[in-house]
Amino acid sequence: MALKSKFLVGSILATFILNGFSSPAQALELDEDTRTVTLDGKGNTVVLSVEQIKRGKRLFNNACAICHVGGLTKTNPNVGLDVEALSLATPPRDNVSSLVSYLKDPMTYDGADSIAELHPSIKSADIFPKMRSLTDEDLFAISGHILVQPKVVNEKWGGGKIYY
């Protein structure tokens, strides 16, 4: 029994050492091209700072990852946070400005109805407490994180359970 425990601990430690220290997302050694995302519907771009990306990741993990781990959507697996799905929404949500608007007052994928009572947002912060203290700067960082992830983890981001 002790041999199995030692083997398990050794395997976990080896996995952490091999994978944990080599991930570019973990080290956040991202070049300017990777940190450049679309700012608005006009095609303007913005280069996020490493600090904004770190902050966006931390805030996303705290407020969003319970339902959107890996860019998936647990409540509707057909609509992920990958760039293609975001671009096909109405209005398109494939830029920082539109994602910030969505986080303030979320709409259905077709843009027809508000879903603020069902989806965490600034508008529904009274029933989703994790949204209460988020500022516009926080929403900008979260949106930037969402748009940078496809460049960092490629098709894994929003790609489905086959990758996790």
UniProtKB/Swiss-Prot annotation:
Family: Belongs to the cytochrome c family. PsbV subfamily.
Membrane topology: Peripheral membrane protein
Species, as recorded: Emiliania huxleyi
Cofactor(s) required for function per UniProt: heme c
Positions that bind heme c: 64, 67-68, 119
Protein name as annotated: Photosystem II extrinsic protein V
A Gene Ontology molecular function term of the record: iron ion binding
Organism taxonomic ancestry: Eukaryota, Haptista, Haptophyta, Prymnesiophyceae, Isochrysidales
Top-level taxonomic group: Eukaryota
Function summary: One of the extrinsic, lumenal subunits of photosystem II (PSII). PSII is a light-driven water plastoquinone oxidoreductase, using light energy to abstract electrons from H(2)O, generating a proton gradient subsequently used for ATP formation. The extrinsic proteins stabilize the structure of photosystem II oxygen-evolving complex (OEC), the ion environment of oxygen evolution and protect the OEC against heat-induced inactivation.
Keywords: Chloroplast, Electron transport, Heme, Iron, Membrane, Metal-binding, Photosynthesis, Photosystem II, Plastid, Signal, Thylakoid, Transport
